[in-house]
UniProtKB/Swiss-Prot annotation:
Purpose of the protein: Involved in mRNA degradation. Hydrolyzes single-stranded polyribonucleotides processively in the 3' to 5' direction.
Domain of life: Bacteria
Family: Belongs to the RNR ribonuclease family. RNase II subfamily.
Gene Ontology terms: biological process: mRNA catabolic process
Record's catalysed reaction(s): Exonucleolytic cleavage in the 3'- to 5'-direction to yield nucleoside 5'-phosphates
Protein name: Exoribonuclease 2
Organism of this sequence: Salmonella paratyphi C (strain RKS4594)
GO terms for cellular component: cytosol
Gene for this chain: rnb
Keyword Repressor: no
């Protein structure tokens, strides 16, 4: 009787449209209940029974109920699930398998089975890739997933690497493929094999991209020739190897090992500028004045070179600092080091006055045993030899940026526009409260940005610098020439690492067209998106493996009185994040560890400060002593507390 009643349907429709609803993201807690976060200000309580229909991170629409003046959300419609493809640990065996996602806020096991075509017989503790197939808000009775890929077994020592690479869907090994002979590119190569080119790298480096040669001219100016490995002499555009490199976009450097962009035969041998081996190269010759200015007369050309020495950063630095026992093999090599050192000092001085110089931060190197165990973590400060190479590469990339801009009008450029214009007024207001007066318009120009950066570098601490970082825009990869505010340069195009960066290979092909005087098509925009995405994934993978190894390394320090110096890098409502100075590990100090009385404590992300009873006790960039309270291996998180 009521089945097709239009009045009833209308009433239902009316009730539905009058019921308040909200769209937001589900935030789970460890207590079983959750919240629907609509925006930064508004959230609704989700009771435990309703949480069974959703997962942390799901974007949903929920019906809002009000009972006794208390609002709660009942999930109704799934807009976007948090989990689609994920990695996790398998539980159970035979026909009753489930998988626990590897995520700090997802604790519930999801029933699953091996997908069609997956041969592996899964057992307890296995790591796997899974894809969600069912969701309660899609009309299914429960969550359900398919296991689409076996990663590794529970006790594999290399779990951090294999799981991380699978999580980000990145390659595990070097690409296959060989390049049997060099291409005929119609390039005349200058024979520079007699010159004393040298490479300076880490002692363990096999993929040597760059070799340097310097000489003093009659007028006292210095001439620098930068020779770069030439993979595009072996790899034709559009070939299988080229397409593989295009997809990978970069060599992926992880603690302990790398996954190259090119086959190892090329990256570590045929293209690598090995000592006493004749190699094809793309070269740039520039003349540098005493004040570090690069002359307009820049020459790019194809060459054949033979590196005369594989030098290591530490040896060269020790020798220049008159330390240690290492000596260059002969006077010719010694003279090269001295000239390159002079170039480094004059270029560094030039950049100091006319561009920007980064503050030196140490690199942290994991020393690993045979089974992936962390034997030590070594802070490697950037020494004078690192700076010699850095200054030479920046100079060479600046030359390429100019030549590509002037001759073609395009290339693969690293572009950074400084501050987001939408933030200029807020930035000026913040600086004013700290006694720095900047013009909101001027600070958006390259010159204004450089001026501000120099003022910030002159401050007694990096506190103010850390406060304005949130106003900065991100660096981008673009085919259009544009300024790089972070370096303080009018344009910057890298071509000095073609073995490990696909964008540099593209710039090689463009520079070769310039050398030959040929027309060449502008690179497609989609390649810049692929490179940006790969760079993001590789960085996340490096961070994830690092977190795992730090947790392993510091696990036995939990609960002990071992003190670590730690720099405060961020303050949030829940506490503060610190970086351990000696090894680079990131740890979290929860607010209750800062002060027992919550009402007397104010942790302000906005100001980067922690106040107790109205007085600032901690601020970002402060260095404090901490001890390790706890290491949570399942989430790879390190909890610290201020040392008593």
């Amino acid at each position: 009787m009521f089945q097709d009643n239009p009045l009833l349907a209308q009433l239902k429709q009316q009730l539905h449209s009058q019921t308040p609803r909200a769209e937001g993201v589900v935030k789970a807690t460890e207590k079983g209940f959750g919240f629907l976060e609509v925006d930064a200000q508004k959230s609704y309580f989700i009771p435990p029974p309703q949480m069974k229909k959703v997962m942390h991170g799901d974007r949903i629409v929920a019906v809002i109920h009000t009972e006794k003046e208390r609002e709660s959300a009942e999930p109704e419609e799934l807009i976007e699930p948090f989990l689609t493809r994920f990695v996790g640990k398998v539980q159970g065996k035979n026909d009753r398998l489930s998988i626990v996602p590897d995520h700090p806020l997802l604790k519930d096991a999801i029933p699953c089975r091996a997908a069609r075509g997956v041969q592996h017989e899964f057992k307890e503790g296995d790591w796997a890739v899974a894809e969600m197939r069912r969701h309660p808000l899609k009309g299914d009775r429960s969550f359900y997933a398919d296991l689409t890929q076996y990663i590794t077994f529970a006790d594999d020592h290399f779990v951090p690497w294999w799981v991380t690479l699978a999580r980000h869907n990145l390659e595990k090994e070097a690409p296959n493929g060989v390049a049997t002979e060099m291409l005929d590119e119609g390039l005349e190569r200058q024979d520079l094999t007699a010159l004393n080119f040298v490479t300076i790298d880490s002692a363990s480096t096999e993929d040597m991209d760059d070799a340097l040669y310097a000489e003093e001219l009659a007028d006292g100016r210095l001439q620098l020739t930068v020779a770069i490995a030439d993979p595009t002499a072996w790899i034709a555009e559009g070939s299988k190897l080229d397409n593989t490199a295009k997809i990978r976009a970069f060599t992926n450097y992880l603690p302990g090992f790398n996954i190259p962009m090119l086959p190892r035969e090329l990256s570590d041998d045929l293209c690598s500028l090995r000592a006493n081996e004749v190699r094809p190269a793309l070269a740039c010759r520039m003349i540098i004045a005493a004040d570090g200015t690069i002359d307009d007369d820049i020459a790019f050309f194809a060459a054949t070179i033979e590196s005369k020495a594989k030098l290591a950063y530490d040896n060269v630095s020790d020798w220049l600092e008159n330390n240690g026992t290492w000596q260059p093999d002969n006077e010719g090599i010694a003279q090269q080091i001295r000239l390159l050192h002079r170039i480094c000092l004059s270029r560094s001085e030039w950049r100091h006055h006319h561009a920007l110089v980064f503050k030196d931060r140490p690199d942290y190197r994991f020393v690993l045993g045979e089974k992936g165990e962390v034997l030590d973590i070594v802070a490697e400060p950037r020494r004078i030899a690192n700076r010699i190479v850095e200054e030479s590469m920046i100079a060479a990339n600046l030359c390429a940026a100019r030549v590509l801009r002037d001759k073609l009008g395009f290339g693969i450029y690293n572009v950074h526009t400084g501050f987001d214009p939408a933030n200029a007024d807020a930035l000026a207001a913040l600086l004013k409260t700290h006694g720095l007066h900047v013009d909101a318009e001027e600070v958006l120009t390259l010159e204004g940005f450089c001026k501000l950066r120099r003022e910030l570098d002159a401050q007694p601490s990096g506190f103010l610098d850390s406060r304005i970082r949130r106003f900065q825009s991100f660096a981008e990869i673009s085919t259009e020439p544009g300024p790089h505010f972070g370096l303080g340069l009018e344009a910057y195009a890298t071509w000095t690492s073609p073995i490990r960066k696909y964008g540099d290979m593209i710039n090689h092909r463009l520079l070769k067209a310039v050398i030959k005087g040929e027309a060449i098509a502008r690179p497609q925009e989609d390649i810049t998106q692929q490179m940006a995405e790969r760079r993001r994934l590789n960085r996340m993978a490096e961070r994830d493996v690092g977190d795992w190894l730090y947790a392993r390394f510091l696990n036995d320090k939990a609960g002990t009185n071992t003190r670590f110096a730690a720099e405060i890098i961020d303050v949030s409502r829940g506490g503060m994040r610190v970086r351990l100075v000696d090894n680079g590990a990131i740890a979290f100090i929860p607010a209750p560890f800062l002060h027992a009385v919550r009402d007397a404590l104010v942790c302000s992300q906005e100001n980067g400060t922690v106040q107790i009873k109205g007085e600032t006790v901690y601020k970002v960039t402060d260095v404090i002593d901490v001890t390790i309270a706890e290491v949570r291996m399942e989430t790879r998180s390190i909890i610290a507390r201020p040392a008593a």
